[in-house]
Amino acid sequence: MNRAFVLLMSVVVLLAWALPRPREAAVTDAVPADAECAECGMSIADARFAARMIVSNGDAEATLYFDDAGCLFDHDRWHPGLVVRSREFAVSPKPRWARSEAVAFIVDPKIGTPMGTGLLAVDAAEAARRRAAGERVESFEGAAAYRKHWMESRFGKPKP
């Protein structure tokens, strides 16, 4: 009986190991291969910095992709009439989508983001670790304000 039990448990463990397990949608799985940034038109070559915005117009919904968090902030600011259902960012260290309410941003010009802003979206645990290490960490609103200042310091204020 003991031998049969061990054999049965071995089979159960092997089956459990072999069965597919659910996983979070990886960012690279969710960004279409031909996606271009809705703001600057660049292809989304590095999904670690990608962002997306789900917008609606009546009954229709669309997903806008961005190559850099800064482009999403710019698009948000320059298109105030959009009905935004969700803003999501690829968060580090393991790229996956997270809603804007659940992310923070590391601000560091040395981070090589596609548009050079140096904004890296991270989850709460990573934000706490980075803040404790002395790095600059901003909320969604703080990162949006940083991007606005970053753009205006380089290109001037937009004309009304």
Positions of the model-derived regions?
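A conserved hydrophobic position in a structured secondary element of the catalytic/binding core
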Residues: F66-D67, V122-A124
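N-terminal secretory signal peptides
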Residues: R21-G81
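Hydrophobic membrane-insertion alpha-helices, especially the h-region
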Residues: V6-W17
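Positively charged n-region of N-terminal signal peptides that target proteins for export
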Residues: M1-A4
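Short, solvent-exposed interaction modules
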Residues: E101-A121
